[in-house]
């Protein structure tokens, strides 16, 4: 990211108020080192990483299989951060990160590509675990000087938000479970449909390169300056946020597993990240940025699917695998045979649905779904062949919000708890609830999305909003 700009550019940019969809458009027009490297079909994932990592400085990991777009997404997001503010961990000797500590401490962001390799380096692994906890990394080094008494010197690497990528198919790879709980994880789209879109886009790019850029350089510079301004505001200290709408969300968040206690923090960060990105359109109350109802909707639209799947312990492609199973039917005390599927049958059904996965990957997903209770496992015959059927735990979760009603509720809440900001909140946030969808750019009135009904969602082409979590 080039940060050189004239004083005139900076002054003119003060009135520029971008939408999150402008960031999506930027991802369609990414250039790195003069090369056109756009990202298509991963809009929500890219926006999620942008809001969590760039805006809110939340450690993040992008998971996928080989060729799933991990590095492409990471590089696109990183291109919005000034070069002088980011550091890339290049794996060397065990102590190499400590030798480079002064350079790391000068930066604001860290990129750790190929996490599976980082986990094999003890010092890097412990460094990332400390950062995941929000802690500074420390170590003591013995100093020996001839003729003097030995001494101990303490070395530190300050806390940094880090972004990393992880290849799922590497059999020797692992993510330390302590680290996994402390970072937000994003899964890329590995469907056959997405592969077809990527192929189509790349072929179109070489056929009509003059038509591929859909955002001019001046607009890109305005967006960069806007982000640079926010990064400057938050370089020393992150601001505090006040979200009166937050309590309304608790009715929609799965509470089956205790892990949701951790993941709620990531949803809060994405909501706050939206408020921070729209800083010019938000106001402060008692030195806190007041989050708008729209920011809550943006966060559900962008992060909703992966947030709910994470809370429900559904692994990557787990929802798709569950859809392959027939309804469980019990006669007497026995589950009917036709309710069970073997690994090769699941693999074939996934293939027909557009997901080409090796049997080992299918087994891993089935194992995780069984551990969580979504599937039941049975052993058949002398060979003890594993078969699976739907378990007792349902992955369905009603998450719809009646936005018109909830807007009235939040206004009543503010009148009671924060009467001093009621007038400004109502005027700035509640008079016009027509917003731009951050994914597809459509104009949507939140008040028209009533009761979370699928027909309303389909008509507005915003299923990812998760007013109702898509059922198996």
Question: Model-flagged regions — what are they?
Answer:
Residues 37-213:
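Conserved ASCE/P-loop NTPase catalytic core
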Residues 78, 268, 363-367:
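Short, hydrophobic-biased segments on the C-terminal half of alpha helices
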């Amino acid at each position: 990211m080039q940060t050189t700009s004239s004083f005139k550019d900076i002054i003119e940019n003060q009135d520029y108020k971008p939408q999150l969809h402008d960031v999506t458009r930027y991802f369609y027009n990414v250039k790195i080192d003069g090369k056109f490297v756009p990202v298509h079909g991963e809009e929500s994932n890219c926006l999620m990483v942008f809001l969590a990592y760039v805006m809110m400085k939340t450690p993040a990991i992008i998971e996928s299989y080989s060729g799933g777009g991990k590095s492409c997404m990471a590089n696109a997001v990183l291109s919005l951060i000034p070069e002088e503010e980011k550091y890339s961990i290049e794996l060397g000797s065990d102590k190499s990160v400590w030798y480079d500590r002064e350079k790391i401490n000068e930066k604001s962001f860290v990129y750790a590509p190929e996490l599976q390799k980082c986990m094999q380096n003890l010092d890097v692994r412990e460094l990332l675990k400390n950062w995941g906890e929000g802690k500074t990394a420390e170590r003591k080094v013995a100093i020996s000087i001839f003729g003097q008494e030995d001494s101990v010197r303490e070395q530190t690497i300050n806390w940094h938000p880090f972004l990393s990528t992880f290849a799922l198919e590497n059999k020797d790879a692992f993510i330390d479970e302590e680290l996994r709980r402390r970072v937000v994880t994003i899964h890329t789209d590995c469907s056959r449909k997405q592969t077809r879109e990527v192929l189509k886009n790349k072929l179109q790019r070489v056929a009509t390169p003059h038509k591929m850029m859909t955002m001019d350089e001046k607009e890109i510079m305005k967006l960069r300056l806007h982000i640079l301004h926010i990064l400057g505001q938050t370089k020393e200290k992150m601001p505090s946020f006040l979200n009166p709408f937050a309590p309304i969300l608790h009715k929609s968040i799965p509470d089956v597993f205790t892990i949701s206690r951790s993941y709620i923090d990531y949803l809060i960060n994405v909501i706050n990240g939206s408020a921070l990105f729209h800083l010019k359109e938000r106001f402060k109350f008692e030195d806190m940025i007041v989050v708008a109802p729209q920011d809550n909707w943006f966060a559900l639209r962008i992060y909703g699917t992966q947030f709910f799947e994470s809370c429900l312990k559904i692994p990557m492609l787990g929802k798709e695998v569950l859809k392959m199973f027939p309804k469980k039917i019990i006669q007497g005390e026995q589950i009917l045979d036709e309710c069970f599927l073997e690994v090769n049958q699941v693999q074939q059904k996934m293939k027909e649905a557009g997901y080409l996965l090796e049997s080992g990957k299918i087994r891993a997903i089935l194992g995780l779904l069984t551990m969580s209770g979504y599937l039941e496992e049975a052993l058949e015959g002398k060979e003890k062949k594993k078969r699976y059927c739907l378990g007792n735990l349902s992955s369905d979760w009603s998450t719809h919000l009646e936005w018109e009603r909830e807007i009235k509720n939040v206004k009543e809440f503010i009148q009671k708890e924060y009467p001093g900001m009621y007038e400004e909140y109502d005027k700035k946030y509640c008079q016009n609830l027509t917003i731009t969808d951050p994914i597809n750019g459509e104009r949507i009135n939140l008040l028209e999305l009533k009761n979370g009904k699928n027909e309303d969602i389909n008509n507005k082409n915003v299923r990812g909003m998760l007013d109702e979590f898509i059922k198996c």
